[in-house]
Amino acid sequence: MSESTKLSLSTTVAQYRKLEAVGDRKAIGQFFVERFDERYFRPVEDSSSKHGFAVLAVACLVIETLESFYQGRLDTKNASTQMFQDFLARDTPLKVLAGENDWFYKDIRCGILHQSESRGGWRVLRSGPLLDAQAKALNATAILRALRSEVLLYAQKIQTDEQLWKNFCKKMGAVCGNC
C-alpha cells in the first residue's frame, strides 16, 4: 500500500487517514464527492461526444459503488445483483427503476456492461423523463443527475449517521488497502 497514492485530485491515502483519525467528517464528505465527481460524473458530463450507453455504464458503476459504501462492503464480488436491489429499494428518485425480475439490473446493467447493448427492448435516451416504462425508455442524463444528488446526500449523511460512518470507514479501509 502506498500512502502517497491519490484517492482524488486533492487527497492522498495518507491525507485521508489523517482526516479519518481526527474524525473530520465534513472534509471527508467533500473528499468523497470530489472522488465521485472526478472518476464518474465529470468524464461523461464534460465529454463533447456524450452517448447514453456510456453514461448509463458509468451510472451502473456509481450505483454499485455507492451501495457498497452504504453497506460497508469490502468488495461486491458475487453480490452485484443484491447491490442493485438494495440501492434501488432506497427512497430515492431512482426507486422507479426497481421492479419485478430485476429488469434494470438484467436488461440495463448486465446488457450494457457485458454486451454493450440494452436488452428487453429498452431504449437509452438523453432527454425526457427518467423512466418511461410504457415506451421502455430511460433518460441516461436524468439518471446520472439523480445519482450525483444521491452522492451529495450520502456525503451529508456520513456526517451524522454513526452506522453509515462506520460502514464508510470500513469500505475506505479496503479502498486504501488496495492502493
Name these PLM-found stretches:
Residues 1-35, 42:
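Surface/interface-facing alpha-helical segments and adjacent flexible terminal/loop regions used
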Residues 12, 71-74, 79, 97, ...:
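Anionic, Ser/Thr-rich low-complexity intrinsically disordered regions
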Residues 27-89:
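Short, contiguous, well-structured surface segments enriched in hydrophobic/aromatic residues
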Residues 57-60, 64, 82, 103, ...:
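A structural signal for well-ordered alpha-helical segments within the folded catalytic domains
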Residues 68, 93, 114-118, 153, ...:
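Alpha-helix capping at helix-to-loop junctions
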Residues 90-97:
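Helix-adjacent hinge/juxtasegments
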Residues 98-124:
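Histidine-centered, metal-coordinating catalytic motifs and their short helical/loop contexts
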Residues 126-179:
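Amphipathic, Lys/Arg-enriched alpha-helical patches that create a basic surface
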